[in-house]
Structure formats: structure tokens, C-alpha cells
Amino acid sequence: MGLLSADLLITLQILPVFFSNCLFLALYDSVILLKHMVLFLSRSKSARGEWRRMLTSEGLRCVWNSFLLDAYKQVKLGGEAPNSSVIHIAKGNDGSNSSWKSVGGKCGTKCHLLDFANSERPLVVNFGSATUPPFTSQLSAFSKLVEEFSGVADFLLVYIDEAHPSDGWAAPGISPSSFEVKKHRNQEDRCAAAHQLLERFSLPPQCQVVADCMDNNANVAYGVSFERVCIVQRQKIAYLGGKGPFFYNLQEVRLWLEQNFSKRUNPLSTEDLSTDVSL
């Protein structure tokens, strides 16, 4: 009975934000439809492109599941960081920062997320996929963070399940850098999608890249769904970013790192630097 009550409470908490997201998708579709109508009436060639609605049954299911994933996530601010199983995406051996390859022609070595953590340095963990526009649009900003703060922190990009697979809840191609990736059928598909992302966006060599396993254990443990960023320090969650896409904020990560860097000169308690913006 207690478990049923907890599930009901979580559902009631989710409903208002779920409906607000549905309203946003409806408004978005209306604006895009109006734009297509204007272009059609003006006989513009741009109107000939395919119009993809965002407010669909598949979209509603994905949005609802994303809120459930966030509500039931294992990770909590100040709590132990889940040591999820992941697949390491190895760099190429030709010395090029932008060259990546899979080991044995398939996937890299299986390891764990905290294998990349150093007890003396914070680990910034950035979760996302190629078909998530808010994530890919922030990759250049993430690269700058890596370049600027790699002297005091480590960085890890975790490639997860596609947010908008082309054979699922597909997003409209809003920019030339948009990706079309199908649902991952196996680990090789997921690693290949990660390679495709890294071929398009050259990440600094200081940033390690891994892919979530096909059981999506990292995605579930950290409640990612679309995108999320967190900071692990001494095996604990020192910063927990909000649920993407609306509360995915790298600027707050920059602020945390600036505070953390200052802490080296003027020691403060870890609690003073901890921030939680998750909903």
C-alpha cells in the first residue's frame, strides 16, 4: 500500500509539468505549421521540406517516460555516485584529436563510469546523444569548459540512448548539423552513433568518451533521458544538473568550476559549493 501511495504521489507531481511540456509542444507545432503555410503561400522552396510534428503519441510517451526516469533516479546531491557500466570509446592511434575508433572493429572496452574519476579532482559527466539538439548545440561550450578547466578537473562524455531517433520520435532538422540516427539495436549501433557524433564535433583530448550499455544502466541511475550534467567529487555527487532539455545548463557547471578553482586558494567546505537544480 505504501509503494502504491508513493507511486501515486510521484504521478501527481509529474502531471503538471508533463502537461506544460505538452502545451509547449503544441505551441511549437503551431508556430512551425504557420511558418510552413506562410512559406507555401509565398511559393518558397523552403516549404517543400517535410514537416515533423513534435506532439505525437510517441512524443507524449517519451516525455512521460523522461519524467518517470527523473523521478526514480538513483542519484542524489551529496549521495554516492552510481558506478554504472559503460563502454569506452577509444581514440585513434594517429595522433589526431578528432580521430576515434572502436576496438576490434566493434566496441571499446567495458569499464565503469567511476574508473575515470580521480579522488583529488572533480569529474564533470556530460550525458547526451547526437539526436538531441540542446545537447549538440552546447558541445562547443562544453569543449571550452574542457580546455579551460582540464588543469583542475576531469571530463567525461557519456553517449546514451537517442533522444530523437529517425525511426521513433524524430525531431525536425533545425540546423545543418542535425543528425539522423535510428534506434540502437545493439551495442555496436550505439558505439557507431558515438563515433558519428565525434566525427562531427572535435572534442579536446582531455575529455574521455564512453557509451552507455544497452540496458541503459547509466541513463536510469542518473535519470538522464535526454541530457544531463553532473559533477562527481570523491565518489559523491557534488553538483546535480537539472533535467534536460529545459534545465540543462552548462553555465552553472562553469560557475561551480570557478568556485572550485577558487577553493584551491581559499579552502571552503564542499557543502558551500554543492548545488542542486534537479526537479
Swiss-Prot record:
GO terms for molecular function: thyroxine 5'-deiodinase activity. It is found in: Endoplasmic reticulum membrane. It is a single-pass type III membrane protein. The active site is at residue 132. Highly expressed in liver and in various parts of the brain including telencephalon, hippocampus, cerebellum, and brain stem, and weakly expressed in thyroid, lung, and small intestine. Not detected in skeletal muscle, heart atria or ventricle, gizzard or kidney. Plays a crucial role in the metabolism of thyroid hormones (TH) and has specific roles in TH activation and inactivation by deiodination. Catalyzes the deiodination of L-thyroxine (T4) to 3,5,3'-triiodothyronine (T3) and 3,3',5'-triiodothyronine (rT3) to 3,3'-diiodothyronine (3,3'-T2) via outer-ring deiodination (ORD). Catalyzes the deiodination of 3',5'-diiodothyronine (3',5'-T2) to 3'-monoiodothyronine (3'-T1) via ORD. Catalyzes the phenolic ring deiodinations of 3,3',5'-triiodothyronamine and 3',5'- diiodothyronamine. Predominantly monomer. Can form homodimers but homodimerization is not essential for enzyme activity. This is Type II iodothyronine deiodinase. It comes from Gallus gallus.
